[in-house]
Every structure is written in C-alpha cells, then in structure tokens.
Swiss-Prot record:
This is ATP-dependent helicase/nuclease subunit A. CDD domains: DEXQc_UvrD. The lineage of its organism: Bacteria, Bacillati, Bacillota, Bacilli, Lactobacillales. It comes from Streptococcus gordonii (strain Challis / ATCC 35105 / BCRC 15272 / CH1 / DL1 / V288). One of its GO terms (cellular component) is DNA helicase complex. Its EC number is 3.1.-.-, 5.6.2.4. The keyword Thylakoid does not apply.
Length: 1216
C-alpha cells in the first residue's frame, strides 16, 4: 500500500476545532487529538491518571497503519507482559473493525496483513525485545542462542555466593590484604562477620545492573563525590548557615523584647535573653569565622543552663500562657537549629582530618566490584544463564559495537514508542536512544505515577525531558493530558486539594500546578454528588497509643471499614466486587482476612506474600525429600513421621527415641527406629505390636522411595509420594484445599524445571531449597481460582493501572520505609558512592592508658550529600504512591488510618507557605496520615473536598456495624449449622431423623463427594436407574476369588492405551510454542517425557506436528501468552436425585483465555473409526469443563474442540 502523508499542524488544528464543535456525546480532547496525529519530532505525552493514554496509543498506531506504516515498522515497549497482551487485543479489535467497514480493497489487504502480523510485531516489554535481539545477534558476542533466564532470586543468590566466596579469598590473601581487611571491617557492623560486607557488595551490584554500562560507571562515577569534595566550600556553607541562624535568633529576641516581652518584664529569662543579645551584638558582617563559631558555642551553652530552661518563659497567669507558649516554641526551634549546626562543625573538623583515609578502601572496593561483576558474568556464561540486566547490557553492547545492526533497527522503525515512560531506568533509556534515529520517539507516561524506584526506575529521566521540551519546543513536543475520564468529580477534587498543598519541586520533585490538576473529562461524572464525597476516617482507639503498632492494621480500623462496606452493600446495593482495599505492603494483613471472615464478607487477596516454602503441605513434602536424601536428619524424619502420611503421635515418637542400642553412646532417630524393628533397643517392651506394624510400613515405604529416587526424576518421585500415601487427595480435603493442591502440583513442576537446568539430583535440589531459606528468600505463591463477587485486597503497587468503583486506602498511619537511608553505603547516579567511614581516631589519654585511639563512625561528605538526595527521592516517591492510590477510585474514595485524636490535635503542623504545607513539615512527616491531617488542620478555613471523621469503639459495636443479609436463604443456616451446638434437644432431633435422611438422600450417600468428569456418567447410571432401590443384589454380589498365579517376569508388560494417553498429554504440555515447533523440538520434548521407551515409540510425532498446521494449532501459536495447559480445577455440582452438592475435580488439557471468549481443547488417543463416536463419548465431559471455565472467569462464550490422535490421521473437531 502506498504511504500517505501525516497531518500538518494546521490540519490538526482544524480537526481539533471540528471535534470541539461536533455533537458527539464523548469527544476527544484537543490534547488527545494532538497526541494521536502529531509527527516529525520526538513527542512526550504527560498523561495524568485516567486520561486515556492507552486510547491515545492505540489510535495513534491505527492512524499510522492507515497511512501505510506496517506494524512491523513500529517498536512498542510496554511495562508488563500483561499490558502488551492487552494492547495487542485492542489493536486486533480496532483493526478488525476498520477492516470490516472499509470498502477499499488495497487498504483491506494491508489491514489483513497487519492483523496477521500483530502476533509477531515488536510489542512487548523491553526485556522480551532484548532477548529476541540476543537470540538473533548474540553470536557476535560469542553467546549461544539457547540461554535461559535466571528469574529466581534464590538461584541468583546461590551463584553470587559462590563467586563472592571465591573472590573474597583471593583478596583476603592478596597483596592488599591489610587494606581489604579494613574495608571488610568497615561494613561488618555488630555481626562481626563478612555478611555485612557481602550484603553491601550485592546492593552495589544491583545498582550497577540498572546502569547502561556497569564497568564504565564504576570508572567514571564511583568515586566522583570524593574526588570533587571541596572542604573550604563546605566550611563556607556551614559558616553561612551559622550566620543566618545567629542573626535570625537576634532578630527574634529583639522583636520579642520590644513587643509581647513587655508583659514579662523582670522575668528571669529576660536576663539570659539580654546576655545572649550582647554576645550576638558583638558580631558584625565582617567578623571572622572563629568569632561566629565562638558565639554559636556560647549561645548554645547558655541555652543549656538551668536545666535547659534559661531562655524559657514560665508563668502561672492563664492570660499569658498562649504568649509564653508561642515564644517558647519559636525559641526552641531556633536553638535546636543552632545545636545542630554546632554538632555539624564538630563533625566537620573530624571529616577534614580523616575522610581522605577512606580513599584507599574505596579504591579497593571499586576494584573488587569490577572483578565481582566480571567474574559473576563469566560464571553465568558457563551456566548459559543470565539475568535480565545482563541481556540488556549485551543488547546495548551489540548496538553500540556493531553499527550495521544499529542501522538496521534505526532504518526499520518508523517510530519508537514507549508506555509508562516514567518507570524507565537508564539501561532501558540507552536502548531506546540506540533504536531511535533521533527524532522518532513517542513517550507516554506520568511522573506523578512513578513508584518503582526500588526497581531502579528513575523518574528524573521523564522529568528532564518534560522540562527540556517545556522550555525549548524545538527539542521535542510536550503534550499534557489532564482530563480524567475514570473518576467522579469528588475523587478528582479530593486529589487536587491534597497534592496542590503537598507537592512541589522542593519536596516532591515536580510542581503540582494547573498543568497537572486533574479535570473531569467524562460529562456523566462531572456533576457533584454529596454521597460520593471523599472521607478521611481515623480510628480513635481507647487503647493506649503505645499498644497500637503503626506497622500493622488494627481490628478497630478494619471494623470501621467493614461497617461502611455493609452499609454500601445493604443500602446502596454495591456489589462486593466493586470494592477494593489498598495497603502499602503485602504483609501483616492477617487481621483484615480474619475480620472479614468473621462478618462473612468474601475477600480475595490479590497476590500474597512470597511464602510458598512456608506452606505446611510444602514443608511436609520438603522434609519427606530431605529424609529420602538422608534418613539421619532427625528434624526432617520427625516431621515426616508426625505428618498425616504416617501419623505418629508424641507418645510413639518418645518410645522410638528410647530405643538406643547398648553399644553406642549416641544415635540418630533413624538408627533407634531400626533398633526398634529388630528388638535391639534398650527398651524393646515399649514397642507394642500395633506400633511395630506402623514402623514396618514406614520403613518399607521409605526404602522403596529411596530406591525409586536413584533411577527416576524428581518429578516422578514427588508424584509417587503423593500416590503412595494419598497425600495430594488428603490436602485437597483440608480447608483451602484447592490452594494446597495447587502448591503441591507446583512443587512437582518446579522440581521438573530445576532438572531441566544444569542442576541434577535430589541432593542438589534439597541444597538449593535450604540455601533459599537460609538467605530468607522464598518462592512466589501459586494462584488459584477465586470467587467472582468478592472484595479485593491488594497493594498500591499492584493496583497501578487499574480502576475500582470504591477504594479504601488502609493503614494510612504506617510509617514510611526509611531503610535505605540507614545503610552504611548510599549510591547516587550523579555523585557516586558515599559511605559511613569507621576511622581510627587518636585521643589524648595518659601514657599508661591504652588504646591510644578509638574507632569512630563518621558520615563522609559524599554520604551526607547522597543521604539528602535519597531522602528527597524517597519522600517524593511516597507522594506519588499516595497519588496512585487516590486516583484508582471511580466513585468514592476512603482514606483510613488510626491515631489518638487528642495527640493529633496537640501536635504542631506548622504554617502554610505560599499555599503549601511548610517544607519542614512535608519533609519530616513519616506517614500518609500525617500529610492528610496536616492539610486538614493548616487549611481548615479552605473548603477541602474531603471530610475528616474520628470513629471510636462505641461506634463499632455489633449492632452498629450490622450484618450482611444473604440472598441465598441457605447461607446463614449453613454457617450456624457448621458450628458446635450445646443444644441437646436439637441434637436429639437430628439423631432421630437419621433414618429418614438416609432414605431420602440415599443417592447422595452412595455418591462420593469428589469425582472426576470421566467418572460421573458411569457412576450415575446404576444409581439413577434404580430410582432409590437397592443397588447391589445380594445373590449376585461380587466376591473376590483368591488367585495364586505367579507373575511371568520373562515377558514385558504390554503397553496400554492409558500409558500412551498419559505420555501424549505430558508431551503436549512440554512442547514450547513460542514459535512453531519443528521435528527436532518435538523429539527433544518427547525425550523429556517421563515414560518407558516402549510407550514413547507408540507416539506418532508426525501427527503432533500436523496439529500445528491446523487452524486451532495456528491460533495456539499466535496466542501463546493466553494459553493455559494442564490446569487443575474444582467446582461444586448438584446431584439431580438427592439435590446434594459434590465436588468435581479434574485437569483441563488446555484452553486459550481471551477477553470475551475461551477456546477449550482436549487431547484424545482412543482408537476410533468415526469421529462422531468420540464426540458422543466425550460431549458431556467437555460440557463439564466448559461449565468450570465459565464459572471461574464469568465468560459464557466457550468454543470446545477435541484433538483426535487415535485415528490414521489427526483430526480436530469442534463440539457443539
């Protein structure tokens, strides 16, 4: 298709006017139109929350495609894989719509090609692109294309520890071992071991990974702060601060004496004030530095006289107390400032003398980091496994060192687009620069929503471009989208009222002015509604405030939220699914879960703490594996014996523990167990016959597992344990069984993935797990199906990009995490490293007293500079986190915290400064709640768009909280019936009705509580056909006959259809489908299948390959990100005869999850003549699968397919 020209500025202006005067109900804004159609230069779109940035991106891409640009000519970077998938779906939908409406055949052909190319277009995360680039050009750096990604933090730590230990030993015995020993001691802290130093090395390494070139940054910036330190300039800064503080105090005292001080004439404090003024008056502008420092010292010393009250007004006259308090507060602030300056001078003198002594240590640290970074990289190369940061660095190296590759991409891409630009790090920015031709970048983001500093994202990359383009449009076009189409006006006004008083360049990194104000863009949400007014709710507990931890949420705080949720649900018919609770972190949310359960409100936590390895069922399995690996591990063996698999009680374990043999003084528990079995223990009489049978069963089972482990994979071993002891079924019957089974299933898959790597064997697997736990890491929890209509609980970070009708931001009083400001090392991109240096300071003692020096920790000047920088950055990010949380709400916003009303009212919140909270209050505040309360107090005369309300215990009684009235009449009864009852009469009534219930519900009694889909039809038929009559005829009842035939071991067992079917299912699960698999890939996948060779030979790989030639196979390949394979499910079904529920469990072979439909497919290896036979046989089974999916996702349109592999040719048939 011939390319069309892009709109000129004049044409864009005309389009904006046309849109503004049109009769459309929802019009595009002038800024949206400008962002969609502008071209010819770099463009930065600052898109406020809810301003339709995704709409703008999609429409811009569509417009470029309509002008003849191919989707393959666009580079589109998204922040997450999920965002990339959603963008592709939107593009598919929009292109399909345009294709359907178009009458131009040439355009239709072009659009059809673009639709087909979306799946392979460069739309995805930067990580996915750099992997693709490295697969293609990695050979230029000598890298193999079959590398894998080190995604597990635990595996990374293991490799890092190996490299660190090796390098540490080299340096510790090297030429500079004395300096190195001093370097290590500088960071050991109280632990007195090398873990403190190792922790700092890993922290520096993580920082280096976010730079575009770690080695270059080490050489150019690492020591920059120390190399550029100018002590004379710093001393002059302190002097200027001292001058300003002393003159300010002099003015304050003189003003006081000339005015309100007359009310206190003759008071003792005034003598001291006059004495201070004499000293201050001796100073002149040209006085020496020493004069100023001497007067500072004298005034501070005077302030400490009389127990620190020498300059304090004390009065018993009530009418003068307010004047006295005002003076005392002002005096206190100024004197504290002077004391801080005196301390700074004292510290500065030490720094001048000792800071340079730290340079040899820092030089060596730089060398160590350079060696560590390089050696660790070489170690990863031997494993052919890399971190995402490594992949990015390789990609940058290829683009920088090979101009022909760089030119290829710069010429290929018509435009380089990036979403969520505010969360870009320096590595990603360098990649974007190299892919761009210099004037074809399109960047969309919002600095107010940059909340990933802990991932090394740098919002200043966005901010620098914002300022540059704002000041000089020739450098690039700045477009600001501030209309919010998501939220009601009450949410927008509350957000504006908070941030225009909170955020500026000084504290917040941007000025929240008219440029950034949120404006209602949706006409239907622009009219005020009093019931949607934002609320600031504080739980005023009667408990002493010391007992309420700021870190956790109190039960009272949760109760006030529950009270409001019940009101919304009962009075305003708000669905639970429309309500979301936001917290700052994933941890310490147990109280929320418990309180919601108590009030029968469904709650779904969206992503819990990474505590997979701490789940009971997984811990039991890990102890089982430890015992198989080494039975002499007493802890693991005890855990296994006590588990539900073998159920040994405390008494039985004690009896075993007493079975020590006479010959040995010390024995492990397993050895004592063997003594018990052979009657060789000291107390054989304690081992009773039943007890001995349990021991024999345990011993037999354990030995069989140990034998099996020698010749089979971890995956097979784990499933053998599940099957031998029915452990998988057992945990499924426990509370939260679906989650527990998902955890066990994931353990087998993780073990399988582990053995796919270069690591092999049970011993190394156990070692890896133990190292993970030793380093206080864990693995991510496993997701499972959750109820549809439930309140959601998630972190603010998790909520970014989402929207919810009603939002409760909880635990507003939680103190900000200041951990990064207490580290002994602080890194700055501009200034390099800053450290706390432990110096050997000489002291004057009598000659006989030793030592003659002490170790003194001092904050070096670069450390102090970096600390101020990081404090500002941290506070600014907390402001942005609050902004993200507040702008998630569509209808109503609740800000919830806790605190003593009395104490909050007594606190000083400062004065307004140019319409904002004072800089000191904003920078010293430690929680969201303090910011909100300060704004409410300082600007109490303003008509703020949120209401403050304290809630007390008397407002949260059971009667006042209320209860949920379930629409299902059985729910409340069920909850009551499940509790223990002390009502004896009622219990007798139940007992008397047993016979009647047995008769009435015979079908349900005969029907097991848990079945699989394939068993249901076979099970129902005999029960339903009898219509309640006895199922088994006593005369023809089956009685097993003894069979003494010995097995013939000379003949190999015949391969069964079930074995082939299981192997085929495992094969289809293992085949990678990120691209069309060829025969080599299929053979490799088959080799990994855990089955006998005789079984594998029965599998026709040509049929498997032909599947990917079918329409369904092509759809799978094109939508691999939507594919779910071997997915377990569970759902309730109702027995038609008895009306009772039973649990249906099964595993789906696979399905594709789209936004509006699901494609379900099932593999069948049954032999057949006509496909209709299998359709009839499995129709009901697929219906059950479809019901399960429909219930889980709330999607009614489900396409069902059978993939038939048992005929002469492969067939894919759709089942209606």
């Amino acid at each position: 298709m011939r390319k069309k020209s892009f709109l000129s500025p004049e044409e864009i202006s005309q389009l904006q006017h046309f849109e503004a005067t049109s009769s459309k109900e929802q019009k595009r804004t002038a800024e949206q139109i400008e962002a969609i159609y502008s071209s010819g230069q770099n463009i930065l779109v600052s898109a406020s929350a809810g301003s339709g940035k995704t709409f703008v991106m999609v429409q811009r891409i569509i417009d470029q495609i309509l002008r003849g640009v191919s989707i393959q000519e666009l580079f589109i970077s998204t922040f997450t894989v999920k965002a990339a998938g959603e963008l592709k779906e939107r593009l598919e939908k929009e292109l399909s719509k345009v294709l359907k409406e178009s009458q131009d055949e040439e355009l239709k052909q072009h659009l059809a090609k673009q639709l087909a190319a979306i799946a392979t277009a460069d739309i995805g995360t930067m990580d996915s692109f750099t992997q693709k680039l490295l697969n293609k050009y990695g050979y230029l750096l000598g890298l193999a294309p079959n590398f894998r990604i080190l995604q597990s933090a635990s595996e990374q730590t293991m490799l890092q520890n190996e490299v660190f230990q090796q390098l540490f030993e080299q340096y510790y015995t090297g030429e500079q071992k004395e300096i190195f020993e001093k370097l290590v001691k500088n960071f050991t802290g109280k632990k007195k071991n090398i873990s403190g130093f190792r922790q700092q090395v890993y922290a520096i390494y993580q920082f280096l990974q976010s730079t575009s070139n770690p080695q270059r940054w080490l050489q150019d910036f690492f020591l920059k702060g120390y190399e550029e330190t100018d002590f004379s300039r710093e001393r002059d800064k302190i002097l200027q601060q001292v001058k300003g503080a002393l003159f300010d105090l002099e003015d304050y005292f003189r003003f006081h004496l000339d005015n309100e001080g007359r009310e206190f004439a003759g008071a003792k404090y005034q003598e001291n004030v006059l004495l201070a003024l004499d000293k201050l008056g001796s100073l002149q502008e040209l006085s020496s530095e020493q004069d100023y420092f001497r007067v500072l010292k004298d005034v501070v010393l005077l302030s400490r006289a009389s127990g620190g009250r020498a300059l304090t007004i004390t009065t018993r006259k009530e009418e003068l107390k307010e004047l006295a308090d005002t003076f005392n507060q002002g005096r206190k602030e100024r004197i504290e400032h002077l004391r801080g300056l005196e301390s700074s001078i004292y510290q500065f003198e030490f720094l001048e003398k000792y800071q340079d002594d730290s340079l040899p240590l820092l030089d060596l640290l730089r060398d160590f980091m350079s060696d560590f970074t390089q050696t660790y990289l070489e170690r990863k190369k031997t494993e052919n496994a890399f971190e995402f940061g490594d992949i990015s660095h390789f990609a940058i190296q290829i683009l920088e060192d090979f101009p022909q590759v760089r030119s290829f991409y710069q010429e290929r891409y018509h435009e380089v687009m990036v979403d969520e630009y505010q969360d870009t790090n320096h590595t990603q920015e360098r990649m974007l620069e190299l892919l761009s031709n210099g004037y074809n970048r399109f960047m969309v983001g919002d600095i107010k929503q940059s909340i990933y500093r802990f991932r090394q994202a740098d919002p200043q990359i966005f901010n620098d471009k914002f300022r540059l383009y704002q000041a000089d449009p020739s450098q690039g076009k700045l477009i600001v989208l501030k209309e919010n189409f998501r939220s009601h006006v009450e949410v927008l006004e509350a957000t504006n009222d908070v941030f225009k008083r909170l955020m500026d360049e000084q504290v917040g990194e941007i000025n929240y002015d008219e440029t950034h104000y949120l404006v209602a863009g949706n006409p239907t949400k622009a009219s005020p509604d009093p019931k949607n007014r934002a609320e600031f709710l504080l739980y005023d507990s009667t408990v002493a405030s010391e007992e309420l931890s700021e870190e956790s949420i109190s039960a009272g705080e949760v109760s006030l939220v529950i009270k409001e949720i019940i009101r919304l649900h009962e009075e305003e018919a708000v669905a639970f699914k429309d309500i979301t609770l936001l917290t700052a972190s994933r941890t310490r949310n147990d109280i929320i879960l418990a309180e919601f359960a108590k009030h029968n409100i469904p709650l779904v936590p969206d992503g819990g703490e990474d505590n997979y390895l701490q789940s009971v069922e997984v811990m039991v399995m890990l102890d089982t594996l430890r015992t198989i690996n080494n039975p002499l591990n007493d802890y693991a063996l005890t855990a296994l014996l006590k588990s539900a698999m073998f159920d040994f009680g405390e008494d039985e374990l004690a009896r075993i523990a007493l079975q020590k043999s006479q010959e040995k003084s010390q024995e492990n528990l397993y050895e004592k167990l063997e003594n018990a079995l052979t009657n060789q223990g000291l107390h054989p009489d304690l081992i009773l016959p039943d007890h001995k049978k349990k021991l024999e069963l345990f011993q037999k089972t354990l030995l069989s597992w140990r034998t099996f482990a020698k010749t089979h994979s971890l995956y097979d071993l784990i499933w053998k344990i599940y099957q031998d002891r029915f452990y998988y079924e057992y945990v499924g019957a426990l509370p939260n069984g679906a989650q527990r089974q998902a955890n066990l299933y994931a353990l087998s898959l993780r073990a399988n993935d582990y053995e796919k790597s270069s690591f092999k064997g049970l011993s190394r697997f156990i070692s890896m797990i133990d190292k993970i736990l030793e380093n206080q890491h864990d693995l991510a929890s496993v997701p499972y199906a959750a109820p549809q209509d439930a309140v959601h609980l998630m972190t603010v970070h998790k909520s970014k990009g989402l929207e919810f009708k009603y939002v409760f931001l909880l635990n507003m009083d939680k103190a900000f995490n200041r951990q990064d400001t207490s580290s002994s090392i602080i890194l700055s991109r501009k200034n390099g490293i800053g450290i706390k240096y432990i110096a050997d300071v000489e002291v004057e003692y009598p000659e006989k007293v030793k030592p003659r020096s002490i170790r003194l920790s001092m904050d070096t000047l670069p450390y102090q500079q970096n600390l101020e920088e990081i404090k500002l950055a941290s506070l600014s990010e907390q402001m942005r986190l609050l902004y993200v949380a507040m702008t998630r709400a569509e209808t109503k916003l609740y800000l919830v915290g806790k605190g003593s009303q009395e104490k909050l009212e007594k606190r000083s919140w400062g004065q307004a400064e140019q319409g904002l909270l004072s800089a000191s209050i904003r920078s010293q505040t430690t929680s969201f709640q303090d910011w909100l309360y300060a704004i409410q107090t300082v600007f109490s005369e303003d008509q703020l768009a949120f209401d403050l309300r304290f809630v007390r215990d008397e407002d949260l009684t059971a009667d006042k909280i209320g209860q949920i009235h379930h629409s299902n009449p059985f729910d409340a009864d069920d909850l009551t019936d499940n509790r223990q009852s002390e009502d004896i009469g009622r219990a007798l009534d139940i007992l008397e009705s047993v016979d009647r219930l047995n008769s009435q519900y015979r079908s349900a009694i005969e029907l097991p509580s848990v079945r699989t889909p394939s068993q249901i039809k076979k099970f129902y038929e005999p029960i339903m056909d009898t219509e309640g009559m006895d199922i088994i005829d006593e005369r023809v009842a089956f009685r097993p006959q003894p069979n003494f035939d010995l097995p013939d071991f000379s003949r190999k067992a015949k391969v069964t259809g079930a074995q082939v079917g299981s192997a085929v299912h495992e094969l289809m699960q293992r085949i990678p489908i990120d691209q069309k698999p060829d025969m080599a890939v299929l053979k490799l996948s088959l080799k990994q299948v855990q089955a006998e060779e005789s079984v594998k030979k029965q599998i026709d790989l040509n049929k498997i390959a032909s599947f990917f030639e079918t329409r369904l196979g092509e759809i799978l390949l094109a939508n691999s990100d939507k594919l779910h394979r071997e997915a377990p499910f569970a759902m309730f079904k109702r027995d038609e005869i008895s009306g009772q529920d039973f649990v249906l469990r099964g595993i789906l072979d696979g399905y594709l999850l789209f936004e509006d439909r699901i494609i379900l497919f099932d593999y069948k290896t049954d032999k057949y003549k006509e496909a209709s036979e299998l359709i009839a046989r499995y129709h009901s089974q697929l219906d059950l699968y479809a019901q399960a999916l429909s219930r889980s996702y709330g999607i009614s349109q489900i396409e069902k397919y059978l993939i038939l592999l048992g005929g002469e040719q492969l067939q894919v048939v759709q089942v209606d």
